[in-house]
Swiss-Prot record:
It holds the Pfam family Ribosomal_S8. NCBIfam families: PRK00136.1. It comes from Halalkalibacterium halodurans (strain ATCC BAA-125 / DSM 18197 / FERM 7344 / JCM 9153 / C-125) (Bacillus halodurans). PANTHER family: 40S RIBOSOMAL PROTEIN S15A. This is Small ribosomal subunit protein uS8. The gene is rpsH. Part of the 30S ribosomal subunit. Contacts proteins S5 and S12. PROSITE patterns: RIBOSOMAL_S8. Belongs to the universal ribosomal protein uS8 family. The keyword rRNA-binding applies. GO terms for molecular function: rRNA binding; structural constituent of ribosome. One of the primary rRNA binding proteins, it binds directly to 16S rRNA central domain where it helps coordinate assembly of the platform of the 30S subunit. GO terms for biological process: translation. The keyword Transmembrane does not apply.
Length: 132
């Protein structure tokens, strides 16, 4: 099966595993998926992730994070820029997710980063997803 949007697939797998409170999930690896997983870890939305080398493209194992009474840390994930409708924003026009409580993941000329980091570096780019 040909996958037309691997980022949407990643977000959907995280959302589904999070909904049923799985401890971890695995997905096919790519450079952009590793960068997104690193952002989610750095911002405290997941516990950890690891890259597992195999004979094909590799696998990313993501360890989900839950609160003390098993409440979800990730309450929402939304894909913004899709293959059929790309969404770009200048540095000054980058969206604030839930008034700063969430993050926007942005692909810029300086790499994949959060909306806050892109504003600090004064770069715009493609708005990939919102996480809150």
């Amino acid at each position: 099966m040909v996958m037309t949007d691997p980022i949407s697939d990643m977000l959907t797998r995280i959302r589904n595993a999070n909904t049923v409170r799985h401890e971890k999930l695995e997905l096919p690896a790519s450079k952009i998926k590793k960068e997104i997983a690193e952002i989610l870890k750095r911002e405290g939305f997941i516990r950890d992730y690891e890259y597992i080398e195999d004979s094909k493209q590799g696998v990313i194992r993501i360890f989900l994070k839950y609160g003390s009474s098993n409440e979800r840390v990730i309450t929402g994930l939304k894909r913004i820029s899709k293959p059929g409708l790309r969404v770009y924003a200048k540095a000054g026009e980058l969206p604030r997710v839930l008034g700063g409580l969430g993050i926007a993941i942005v692909s810029t000329s300086k790499g994949v980063m959060t909306d806050k980091e892109a504003r600090q570096q004064q770069v715009g780019g493609e708005v990939l997803a919102y996480v809150w």
